[in-house]
Amino acid sequence: MFEQRVNSDVLTVATVNSQDQVTQKPLRDSVKQALKNYFAQLNGQDVNDLYELVLAEVEQPLLDMVMQYTRGNQTRAAQMMGINRGTLRKKLK
């Protein structure tokens, strides 16, 4: 049997190539590619609040999945995320 080890320091994204092989790449590589695509579509236009845009795209799925993983346990979710439970509650509203 294959043993799958999880490196808790690196988030990965599974991708399927043209030969139907599944590969893992760091999430940061996917973020870089998404930003390259975004900048290419700007055609020289100025952009404001890019930091907020990226955080909004990442934060909500993070909250959703952590809450699902902890089965709604806010204390455990806050501990997993390394934030105060009160902060988590505000973000969930």
Swiss-Prot record:
Residues 74-93 bind DNA. It holds the Pfam family HTH_8. Keywords: Activator, DNA-binding, Transcription, Transcription regulation. One of its GO terms (biological process) is regulation of DNA-templated transcription. One of its GO terms (molecular function) is sequence-specific DNA binding. InterPro entries: Fis_DNA-bd, Homeodomain-like_sf, HTH_Fis, Trans_regulatory_Fis. PANTHER family: DNA-BINDING PROTEIN FIS. Homodimer. Belongs to the transcriptional regulatory Fis family. Activates ribosomal RNA transcription. Plays a direct role in upstream activation of rRNA promoters. This is DNA-binding protein Fis. It comes from Proteus vulgaris. The lineage of its organism: Bacteria, Pseudomonadati, Pseudomonadota, Gammaproteobacteria, Enterobacterales.
